[in-house]
């Protein structure tokens, strides 16, 4: 028989610590990150994506989980000038231990899309969980809204080779795609990125949801899933006599 409802404050530390709290039938648990410190070796991309109501976090999850994107440019090819043209590009938004949300690409002006974007920098990219095992294990068709997609429309920018961002972007790409290190130097590959203007997510029934640029970059997936972050835990429990 339930005689009272208590509010218990406790602290839960990393995987090497233990919390002892006498409680039965936890009703609500709210977890908030306090420290923000990251132990990179312990960060793992969760197997299950965020809930549909966590739209910004879902966008970041898809981007960080993806190894490639579809990229749409405005064609400069003679017979289809002005038409949309789609190709596939390898992607990294940072090493596995550091999601930035910035889509970095390894591009060359010799490529059809690279030439298009040199003329008109407007671009749209799409990443989807259809490239992972998630949709397959859930038996979601790639077109099923629950097989989540993030669509980013923005400006294509060549990253300045003299900056630390260029080094970071290149390292991030090589970390995800080691074969890039051996691509022909004569093709003069370089690091580029997409600066978002509009961010859309389709992850459930009801249509596309818009995510503000601010919310997108504030939703840091790698901090949320870190196993060694110190947490404050507030639990509402039933106390049984």
Regions found by a protein language model. Give the residues of each.
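Binding-site signature for planar aromatic cofactors or substrates
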Residues: 6, 10, 16, 20-241
């Amino acid at each position: 028989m339930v005689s009272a409802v208590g509010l218990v404050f406790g602290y839960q530390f990393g995987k090497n610590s233990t919390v002892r709290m006498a409680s039965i039938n936890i009703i609500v648990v709210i977890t908030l990150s306090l420290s923000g410190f990251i132990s990179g070796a312990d960060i793992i991309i969760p197997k299950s994506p965020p809930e549909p109501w966590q739209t910004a976090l879902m966008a970041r999850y898809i981007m960080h989980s993806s190894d490639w994107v579809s990229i749409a440019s405005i064609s400069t090819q003679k017979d289809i000038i002005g038409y949309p043209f789609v190709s596939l590009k390898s992607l990294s938004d940072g090493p596995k231990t550091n999601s930035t949300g910035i889509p970095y690409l390894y591009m060359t002006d010799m490529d059809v899309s690279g030439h298009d974007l040199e003329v008109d920098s407007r671009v749209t990219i799409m990443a989807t969980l259809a490239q992972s095992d998630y949709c397959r294990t859930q038996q979601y068709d790639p077109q099923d809204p629950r097989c989540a997609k993030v669509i980013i429309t923005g400006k294509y920018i060549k990253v300045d080779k003299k900056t630390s961002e260029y080094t970071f972007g290149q390292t991030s790409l090589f970390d995800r795609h080691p074969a890039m290190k051996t691509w022909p130097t004569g093709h003069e590959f370089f690091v580029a990125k997409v600066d978002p203007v509009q961010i859309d997510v389709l992850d459930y029934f009801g249509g596309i949801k818009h995510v503000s640029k601010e919310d997108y970059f504030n939703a840091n997936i790698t901090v949320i899933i870190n196993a060694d972050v110190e947490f404050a835990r507030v639990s509402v429990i039933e106390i049984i006599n």
